[in-house]
């Protein structure tokens, strides 16, 4: 069994105000700071940024105004912006896309090659500049992962730069920073965490240790969403822990059909990744259950029956209620119905057979069609 963790995590209310000290600990003297444009109006973020700039007067600032997930072309442009001023480290503050952008910039600044040449799992690359991540949304897990997602516009596919050298050196998680985010974004990010937990839990490559993280991450996130009190810092910390656990489990096992569906639908319709995954998650779980997979019972600590089958059915019932509570849509608003479900199933199957292979029961194009029909 193999298992890896890498990023130092600091989590707590107001911890982002201590960011200058955490940056100093990495021996940065001229940090490049990338931050989400939608944070600009946050008074708390302004206080964080003021502290950084006061401590590091020659900081290089970049406001990321790019909408949606970054492209390789955008990565090239941002890297060139920073290359002119030669920062000695990167601090990325924002949602998952901005954190991934920070990983890409940190790597490209020490590897003067086209960004597209690093897509996939690049080998023999130089170490990146040290990176500190500060998430403003909790669920993508980008703050602690080595994966950095980028879109290849020519192919219309979501790929990435996935080197273990991408691991952030530190991640500073402060629930206060997420408090001004729109609630729909908070929920979509939390659903992304649930997808990571479920896909990794059922993955053929799971280990006993990865499953501990899958279960803990699922329960923290699921019950925070169920309670409907996401305006509380304590609930946001549960989402933060769920995000860390889910992504750690995913890195140490593998994904499944839900993540695959989300990648395809998200790129095609520019849907936030977490919401795209949420659309499919429950129906993939139900498909697996109908095929005899009842191990989801382990995710349900409040089960009223010792029967794994009954406990899984009970959990799926709770999922139904959560979806109603959160108003998670089906595929109809995105133009899908019975008439084009087969085409969507075929396209997803052609693009993402690797994700399908991770499912705990056989999952193929016919399976995808079944799931999609139930969502139209």
Pin down the residues of each PLM region.
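ATP/NTP phosphate-donor binding region
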Residues: 1-89
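Fold-independent oxyanion-binding glycine-rich loops
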Residues: 7, 13-14, 36-37, 66, ...
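C-terminal charged capping/lid subdomain of soluble metabolic enzymes
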Residues: 303-376
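C-terminal catalytic subdomain
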Residues: 253-311
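Glycine/threonine-rich beta-strand-loop-alpha-helix active-site module
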Residues: 73-175
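Carboxylate- and glycine-rich phosphate/diphosphate-binding segment that chelates Mg2+/Mn2+
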Residues: 147-253, 360
